[in-house]
């Protein structure tokens, strides 16, 4: 039987990975570590698809980590994620449990599964001024020139692209100090969802979250003093809803552009996961359409080495 340190459940948005991970954690009597770059923020719930009800299975709450750990407006980064992951990972292991890592932020997943050596990167005002007038497309092209941790998966606003370039520039001239990060042997399960079904679920989920008050959530965040620029930085829902709230888009424009952006995001997530396979990760894909019991049985078989 392979000696795994953890189980990773990954997949694009709307693939059902969170209820799958929760059901698996319930079966194995363990806890979940989230790998979602936006669900770490408190009060950003509907816009990040933070379905906390998914973490209750048959009336039993499943303990989860790295959700609701930072205030809106804060620029949390992958260096901090590595640090916080390790604290959560070690606390779960000390209980004698096999942690379940679950999420769709490829850079977060890969940073801990591969143990990238990272360090905090200060702001570079001169570089920011130089890049300020570039479009997102131009910045994405600049970013492609680096041998980089980043791809365009989460770089969907000008500010995020500039920050990604800032990090790459800093790493180019500052050698990364040796920092111990444990080599983790993870069983990696990917949730494979048919493209048309994924698109249908994305649209349905978007309409549902809007009905549940996603616009009000963004208004509430701005009323709490979070600047529109900071919300736009988080991309996707927060970018387009903020543009609607401040009057830059009509409701119809917001919906159409946001729907398209989420579809594109899911496609980029799958591109990242396929890239992980090319970079040496073994991902065991399971159909999103299988009944939950069959998905769990699939993982148990893989844990046994079958």
Swiss-Prot record:
What is this protein for, i.e. what is its function? Answer: Catalyzes the transfer of a dimethylallyl group onto the adenine at position 37 in tRNAs that read codons beginning with uridine, leading to the formation of N6-(dimethylallyl)adenosine (i(6)A).
Q: What are the record keywords, sorted?
A: ATP-binding, Magnesium, Nucleotide-binding, Transferase, tRNA processing
Cofactor entry: Mg(2+)
Instruction: Give the catalysed reaction(s), semicolon-separated.
Output: adenosine(37) in tRNA + dimethylallyl diphosphate = N(6)-dimethylallyladenosine(37) in tRNA + diphosphate
Q: Does the keyword Lipid metabolism apply?
A: no
Q: Which residues bind substrate?
A: 13-18
Tell me what gene encodes this: miaA2
Q: What InterPro entries does the record point to?
A: Dimethylallyltransferase, IPT, P-loop_NTPase
Q: How does it assemble?
A: Monomer.
Protein name stated in the entry: tRNA dimethylallyltransferase 2
Site positions for Interaction with substrate tRNA, renumbered to this chain? 105
Q: Which family does it belong to?
A: Belongs to the IPP transferase family.
Q: Which SUPFAM superfamilies match?
A: P-loop containing nucleoside triphosphate hydrolases
Organism, by scientific name, is Bacteroides thetaiotaomicron (strain ATCC 29148 / DSM 2079 / JCM 5827 / CCUG 10774 / NCTC 10582 / VPI-5482 / E50)
* Enzyme Commission number, as recorded: 2.5.1.75
Question: A single Gene Ontology molecular function, please?
Answer: ATP binding
């Amino acid at each position: 039987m392979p000696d795994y340190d953890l189980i990773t459940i990954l997949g694009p948005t709307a693939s059902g990975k969170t209820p799958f991970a929760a059901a698996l954690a319930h079966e194995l009597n363990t806890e979940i570590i989230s790998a979602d770059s936006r669900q770490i923020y408190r009060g950003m719930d509907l816009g990040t698809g933070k379905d906390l009800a998914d973490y209750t299975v048959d009336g039993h709450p499943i303990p989860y980590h790295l959700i609701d750990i930072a205030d809106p407006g804060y620029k949390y980064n992958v260096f901090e994620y590595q640090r916080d992951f390790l604290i959560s990972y070690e606390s779960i292991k000390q209980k004698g449990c096999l942690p379940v890592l679950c999420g769709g932020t490829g850079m977060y997943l890969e940073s801990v599964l591969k143990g990238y050596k990272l360090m905090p990167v200060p702001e570079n005002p001169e570089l920011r001024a130089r890049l300020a007038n570039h479009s997102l497309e131009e910045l994405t092209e600049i970013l492609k020139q680096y041998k980089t941790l980043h791809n365009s998966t989460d770089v969907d606003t000008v500010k995020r692209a500039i920050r990604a370039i800032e990090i790459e520039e800093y790493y180019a001239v500052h050698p990364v100090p040796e920092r111990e990060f444990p080599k983790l042997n993870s069983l990696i399960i990917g949730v494979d969802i048919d493209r048309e079904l994924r698109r249908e679920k994305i649209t349905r989920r978007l309409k549902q979250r809007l009905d549940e008050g996603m616009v009000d959530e963004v208004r509430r965040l701005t009323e709490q003093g979070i600047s529109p620029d900071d919300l736009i930085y988080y991309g996707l829902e927060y970018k387009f809803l903020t543009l609607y709230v401040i009057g830059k888009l009509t409701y119809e424009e917001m919906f159409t552009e946001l729907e398209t952006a989420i579809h594109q995001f899911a496609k980029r997530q799958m591109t990242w996961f396929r890239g992980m396979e090319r970079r040496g990760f073994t991902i065991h894909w399971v159909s999103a359409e299988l009944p939950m019991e069959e998905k769990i049985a699939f993982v148990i078989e893989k844990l046994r080495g079958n």
